């Protein structure tokens, strides 16, 4: 009974923490440097989750997914940093990027406390929720508020990768035992 309540609380907390478009019940207003910070932070957070999975999971599908997340998100980080440098755009910390980092610390603690199949389920459930939220934020907040055409184009190019990650995570989620 306790495990079910804990998992339910984790899922509810995770969903509410990553509901960035609902941030403070209104869409946050972000400058391009703040958008760059949110994009970098979101990718760094998912790399951190993937590294936990690579250390804790024994499931080949989870391990392969985590490897893909690390590779893809580190690639996006490198591209974002190169773009920021080319545009002379210094990412600026803001309420959204700070909230992402704070929420990630809580999620990492929760993931680190799990083992075996409970870990695999918690990790992949988090990945599904996280990617849904990040996609919604990129589509509903970051792209519409980007002033710089190259930054906007970069975000638009990253979107299909995020959607592929979501599809992959959803497929793995459907294959895990309930």
Regions found by a protein language model. Name each.
Residues 2-9, 18-178:
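His/Met- and acidic-residue-enriched segments that coordinate or traffic transition-metal cofactors
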């Amino acid at each position: 009974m306790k495990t079910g309540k804990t998992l339910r609380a984790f899922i509810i907390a995770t969903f509410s923490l990553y509901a960035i478009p609902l941030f403070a019940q209104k869409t946050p207003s972000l400058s391009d440097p703040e958008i760059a910070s949110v994009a970098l932070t979101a990718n760094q957070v998912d790399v951190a989750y993937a590294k936990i999975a690579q250390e804790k999971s024994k499931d080949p599908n989870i391990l392969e997914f985590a490897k893909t997340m690390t590779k893809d998100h580190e690639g996006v980080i490198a591209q974002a940093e190169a773009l920021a440098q080319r545009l002379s755009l210094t990412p600026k910390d803001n309420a959204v990027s700070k909230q992402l980092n704070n929420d990630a610390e809580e999620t990492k603690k929760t993931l680190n406390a799990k083992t075996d199949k409970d870990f695999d389920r918690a990790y992949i459930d988090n990945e599904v929720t996280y990617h849904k939220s990040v996609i919604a934020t990129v589509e509903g907040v970051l792209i519409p508020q980007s002033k710089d055409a190259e930054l906007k184009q970069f975000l638009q190019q990253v979107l299909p990768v995020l959607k592929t990650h979501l599809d992959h995570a959803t497929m793995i989620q459907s294959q895990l035992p309930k």
